[in-house]
Amino acid sequence: MKINIAKSSGFCFGVKRAIDLSIKLAEERKKVYVLGDIVHNSFVVSDLKKKGIKKISRIKPAVNSTLIIRAHGAPRKTFQKAIRSGYTIVDATCPKVKAIYKIAKHLEKHNTIIIIGDNNHAEVKGIAGQLETKPLTIETSKDLPLKKLRRVKKAAVITQSTQTIDNINAIMTCLKPIIPELKLYNTTCRTTRTKQQEIKSMPKENDIMLIIGSKRSANTKRLYQISKNINKKTYWIEHAGELESEWINNVESIGIMSGASTPDHVTQEVVRRLKPR
């Protein structure tokens, strides 16, 4: 049985940066907190907890404490509240996401901003939270806010960094007849595009596909969806313990793709379980 691991599997630049920054802070400072999960992966969150980093869900008054802003970013109000509450802020927001902030704020001056992304995702909330006016957020071409869209004369469309090109194109096709002046600024990151390009070929070349990553991970979800549409024998697992023996019976090749927040050791454990003993 041949096991083929995607070249783009595993951590993206922004995730690795946020984790490395957090570990360094844990070594240098005593009271270190992170608002929410630093990334969407339980193994990473657990490892950081063991190093002394405490996760909080709400900002409360603090003394001599450091607050890490997660890789997905956060609204401006979150930064302001943390400073008022006494925290020293260390911003681990992915630089690619910060670049989206800059683009969105610039475009807002003369456009209605439309975000193609998951409405409840931390990254999308962070982007929306940089703007003076609440943007319109669209998840799929099936949930267009038509009444609001028909009032828009000029719009700039930006994208959550992990969106698929197929979803973006489908939404843009629906928006073009509605909005007179419309321009797309595709702000999906390079790693996302690379992973999604690779996952379009791997399912054709392997008997089954394993997608490894958290069920809360947006980028992993999209990798799974793309692969599943091509190869029905695509399975989404978080760790090796979720492997089913029936999946690999009489299989000659297995393709593996790990999400952008999946540690290498998790992927390697899956590979070890798959190899015959």
Identify the meaning behind each predicted range.
Residues 1-277:
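The feature marks the mature, well-folded catalytic cores of soluble enzymes
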